From Swiss-Prot:
InterPro entries linked: Thioredoxin, Thioredoxin-like_sf, Thioredoxin_CS, Thioredoxin_domain
Known function: Participates in various redox reactions through the reversible oxidation of its active center dithiol to a disulfide and catalyzes dithiol-disulfide exchange reactions.
Source organism of the structure: Escherichia coli (strain K12)
Protein family according to the UniProt entry: Belongs to the thioredoxin family.
Protein name as annotated: Thioredoxin 1
Molecular function, one GO term: protein-disulfide reductase activity
PANTHER family linked: GEO12009P1 (PTHR45663:SF11)
Length: 109
């Protein structure tokens, strides 16, 4: 796992995401979720490739049940792109690296 990925908790979400400057991609995931495990290596690569433009963060919804309902998370993996503390874009489900890069490039422009 990339050392560039931030591991969030319900307690740290406010500071690490909502009060942070710039763009942050938050992956809402769980240990038992197969598609979540499929995109984990892709997120590691994205964290490296987009360093300086984007911060990648992960929130385990089983260990941190308070945050996901605030954002209407119903299925996982769900990726929320935050810009300066506001949700700028959402993607639900596993994506290929190409699809994720298209999503990010379109929303970071």
């Amino acid at each position: 796992m990339s050392d560039k990925i931030i591991h969030l908790t319900d307690d740290s979400f406010d500071t690490d995401v909502l009060k942070a400057d710039g763009a942050i991609l938050v992956d809402f995931w769980a240990e038992w979720c197969g598609p979540c495990k499929m995109i984990a290596p892709i997120l590691d690569e994205i964290a490296d490739e987009y360093q300086g433009k984007l911060t990648v963060a992960k929130l385990n919804i089983d260990q941190n049940p308070g945050t996901a309902p605030k954002y209407g998370i119903r299925g996982i993996p769900t990726l929320l792109l935050f810009k300066n503390g506001e949700v700028a874009a959402t993607k639900v489900g596993a994506l290929s690296k190409g699809q994720l890069k298209e999503f990010l490039d379109a929303n970071l422009a």
